[in-house]
Curated annotation (Swiss-Prot):
Keyword Ion transport: yes
Function: Na(+)/H(+) antiporter that extrudes sodium in exchange for external protons.
Disulfide feature: none
InterPro entries membership: Na+/H+_antiporter_NhaB
Pfam family, one: NhaB
Organism: Shewanella baltica (strain OS155 / ATCC BAA-1091)
Single GO MF annotation: sodium:proton antiporter activity
Keywords in alphabetical order: Antiport, Cell inner membrane, Cell membrane, Ion transport, Membrane, Sodium, Sodium transport, Transmembrane, Transmembrane helix, Transport
GO CC annotations on file: plasma membrane
Residues spanning the signal sequence: none
HAMAP family registered for this protein in UniProt: NhaB
Protein name per UniProt: Na(+)/H(+) antiporter NhaB
Gene name linked to the record: nhaB
Segments passing through the bilayer: 28-50, 67-87, 96-116, 131-165, 254-274, 316-336, 364-384, 396-416, 454-474, 481-501
Length: 533
């Protein structure tokens, strides 16, 4: 029987999302105008924020751009905020959008070099603990300069490559043969061709490495202004450059990095929380043979491409460290240099590089619409006033925890943007000093980045991993990710809180002032970067 028009509408609306989810979003769209016009705009605003957080938390059911975008369009249409306010937010955060558009695409053209490096780590180093530490540290270093999504994308590509090679060889085929590595490895008679114990151990090994790398991106990403998109927003509002940002964060980020690496060592050493899986000898032999096969096939042309990518990588790090141009423009230069010297001139080949980041860039524009509602309806004013009622380190800890809890269930770009805007408003209104604002900016940045490793909702890199084609192959579920992230969540959150609560952040910052490593900023500088006030 053909579907009725109403059934067809529901079927098309939000695609393959569950029916209950579609009903929830439609209910939100009906309820919001009623609350805004007949109850209270403040209540309606908070309901919208909670609905938006719900769409982010349900990202596995439906990408948040569509449901969140519908809520944002309705909010503008009924007057909760204005289109000009949304545009103002986007203008104020243009550098972040350029970072996502150009930097992520630029690193796409450096994937060969990164693949080469991670492949060598796995095939040359036999100690599982050492491999884990190297993956965690390499991800942390790369994420301090590159986008975390890209770093995870590269490691996923390495893992998929290795999984497919093992699956192919274990199924009785050679390296060059076509093979479906997503099959369960049964022959025509339905019998297992693969050694299940060996395959299970290999899956565990890959899960371990991907989780260490994912946490590594958080450890490195919090350290610099380009490590995560929200860092750039916070740096822009505080008027900090690359070096100053790294120095100001270091009293929290350095102890956290050390404790994170120590956690990596301990969970591997004692095989707890799902870690400690060893790479089977037979699998290692296959991977080494494949790496040797690839090395033998590599031509001078291929080697030249790797050299070009390495040189562009040096330019990228130098350009960012010395602030030779805005982040987005450096990303654009990476695209131009890598493609020009490596001969990527086809328009379709260029277009693939932008596929990864543009959906999230569009989602970020929707974030700014919700931020517009928060500003126009003064939603966070009571919360901020309560937090500002405390003084000194307690105030900093409250902001750290408030950011951390929200970042566990929501996107940290959204959370960081909201809080830094509110603290900036407090500075402009004379409620806090500029020095206290700078300390609060550190608490907001670290609180947004560190506890968010708790769930895939908080870290974009984790969500990207969970929704990748690799996750089901290596049996990496939402619950398993949360469990494996738990030791890191506990350690990173507590060490971050302790660095602030004990006064270490404040004392170290004062030392940096006294040694002229950083300078005192004035509140007047803020007026040039005010967002929506």
């Amino acid at each position: 029987m053909p579907a009725t028009m109403s059934q067809a509408f529901i079927g098309n609306f939000l695609g393959n999302s569950p029916k209950w989810y579609k009903t929830a979003i439609l209910s939100f769209l009906i309820i919001n105008p009623l609350l805004f016009f007949y109850v209270d705009p403040f209540v309606a605003g908070w309901v919208l924020v909670l609905e938006f957080i719900f769409t982010l938390a349900m990202a596995l059911k439906c990408y948040p751009l569509q449901p969140g975008g519908l809520l944002a369009i309705e909010a503008v249409a009924i007057g909760m905020t204005s289109a000009s306010q949304v545009l103002h937010e986007i203008e104020a955060n243009l550098e972040v959008l350029l970072l996502l558009v150009f930097m992520v695409a630029g690193i796409y053209f450096m994937k060969q070099l990164l693949l080469f490096g991670f492949t060598k780590i796995i095939t040359k180093v036999r100690s599982k603990v050492l491999v884990s530490l190297m993956f965690c540290l390499a991800s942390a270093f790369l994420s301090a300069f590159l986008d975390a999504l890209t770093v995870i994308a590269v490691i996923i590509a390495v893992a998929v490559g290795f999984y497919s090679i093992y699956h192919k060889v274990a199924s009785g085929k050679d390296f060059g043969a076509d093979h479906d590595h997503t099959s369960e490895g049964k022959n025509a008679a339905g019998e297992d061709q693969l050694n299940e114990e060996e395959l299970g151990a290999f899956r565990g090994f890959l899960r371990n490495l991907l989780m260490h790398a994912g946490v590594g991106t958080a450890l490195g990403g919090v350290c610099t202004m380009v490590g995560e998109p929200q860092n750039l927003i916070i740096a822009a509002q505080a008027n900090w450059q690359f070096g100053e940002f790294a120095v100001r964060m270091s009293p929290v980020t350095v102890p956290v990095l050390i404790s994170g690496i120590l956690t990596c060592y301990l969970v591997e050493k004692f095989g707890i929380f799902g870690y400690g899986a060893k790479l089977p000898t037979a699998v290692h032999r296959i991977l080494c043979e494949y790496a040797a096969h690839e090395d033998a096939r590599r031509t001078n042309k291929d080697n030249m491409k790797l050299i070009v990518q390495a040189l562009v990588g040096v330019w990228l790090i130098a350009g960012l460290a010395l602030h030779l141009a805005s982040v987005g423009l450096i990303g654009l230069s990476v695209i131009i240099l890598t493609t020009a010297f490596n001969g990527v001139t086809d328009e379709h080949a260029l277009g693939k590089a932008f596929e990864e980041a543009l959906p999230f860039t569009a989602l970020l524009a929707v974030f700014f619409a919700v931020v517009g509602v928060i500003i126009d309806q003064h939603l966070f004013a009571p919360v901020i006033q309560w937090a500002l009622g405390y003084e000194g380190n307690t105030q900093l800890v409250i902001f750290y925890i408030a950011n951390g809890l929200l970042s566990m269930v929501s996107d940290n770009v959204f959370v960081g943007t909201v809080y830094i805007n509110e603290v900036k408003a407090a500075l402009i209104n004379g409620q806090i000093t500029r020095d206290q604002f700078d300390l609060l900016a550190v608490a907001i940045n670290t609180g947004t980045n560190l506890p968010s490793v708790a769930t895939p909702n908080g870290q974009a890199a984790f969500l990207f991993l969970l929704t990748s084609a690799l996750a089901p192959l290596i049996r990496l579920s939402y619950g398993r990710m949360v469990w494996m992230a738990l030791p890191y969540t506990i350690v990173l959150s507590i060490v971050g809180v302790m660095a602030i609560q004990t006064g270490f952040l404040e004392q170290a910052t004062q030392y940096f002032y006294d040694s002229h490593t950083i300078i005192h900023h004035s509140a007047k500088e803020v007026l040039g970067t005010v967002s929506g006030h």
